[in-house]
Amino acid sequence: MYQTRPDDYDAFRCIAGACPQTCCAAWEIVVDPDAQDAYLRLRHPLAQKLRRVMRVDADGDTYFAQSDGRCPFLCADGLCELQRTLGAQSLCRTCRDFPRWEVLLCDRVEQGLSLACPEAARQLLARTAPLRFVSVRIPDDGYVPGARERRLTEVLM
C-alpha cells in the first residue's frame, strides 16, 4: 500500500489566533468515539462543560453544540480552551487533523490540506516550485487512517 501526499504536507503549521478566519465556527465539529469516551471519563474542571455541550445528531454522530455559531471552546483570542487547558493531545480528531484530510482508497492512502484553511491556501499559493506529490510504501496489514496516532483515551487518562 502507498501513501501519497503533497511534498509540503508536513510543512503546514496552524497560525491559530493569528488566522484571519477560524475553523472553530460555522460547521459541526464531530467528536470521534475515542474522544467522546475520554471526555466522558475525564476528571477535570473542564469535564462538566464538555458533557454539557456534547450532543448527538440524527445520524448518531456526537458533536459540540455551538454558541452563536462558534465552538463553545473557542476563546476570544482565537485559541482553543481545550488545547490551552488539556494540551493538543486532548483534541477530538476533527480539531486535531483539520485542515489535513486522509482518504483510504483500494491500494493507497491519499492525504492533503483543505483549502478551506486560509493558511493552507496561502502555503499553496506562495509556492514558487511546482506542486509535487510524494508516495511512500506503508504497511498494508489492516491500515486504518489515523491509527498511528496515540489513542486519545490513553493520553487523557
Q: PLM features: what roles do these ranges have?
A:
Residues 1-49, 55-69, 75-157:
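Short loop/turn segments that flank or connect secondary-structure elements
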